Amino acid sequence: GGMKHLPVQEELLHIINECNLMYWCSTIMRCAYQFISAKVEEKGEPPFEIPNLRFLSMAKLQKGESISPMITLGYMLEEMIHGDFVKYIHNGHPVPCTEPPLSDEEYKIAEFLCFTQHVQYLQTKGLAFISDYQGSGNLLTDPQILTSDLGVDMFGLGNVKEGFNRFTTEHSCNKYCKWFELDSLAHPSTAAAL
């Protein structure tokens, strides 16, 4: 089947939720990069390259006039992604995707994104982190924010509770976690914030 549209008002709400999610993910990722910059300033350059990634730009467009008093048309405008689309991390498990196999360069990006999840988890004191990382080149899109039991679908429909609950046991610290001296993951009440 082809692409399907939701009823107009439901689609507008979905667009608003998607734009808010991208705003939150961009902000959370900037916080992780601020941590990285501060640590590099303190320790010097790491012995490996830091990928320069960002979430694509997105906006909600709304038509000025409506087709009826109860219906407002809205559209989501996204930056174009060029190149092959890659799924780096699924929102159910905090490890690099293995199907289809990632190239060496894609695996390095996935490993870095696993590290950013660790940073985000510590920065939020065990409350949240970005997952479902995917995109192409240095652009990321269509993420999810996994949270503790703060609320059902607080940031979107992809908040996989089981994925969040498994994070501290399934995350495997890598060269980034070690070089940036991240505290090991423990129960959220004992995890030190960055």
Model-derived regions: residue spans:
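Conserved structural core of kinase catalytic domains
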Residues: 1-110, 140-194
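Catalytic-loop of the protein kinase fold
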Residues: 111-113, 117-148
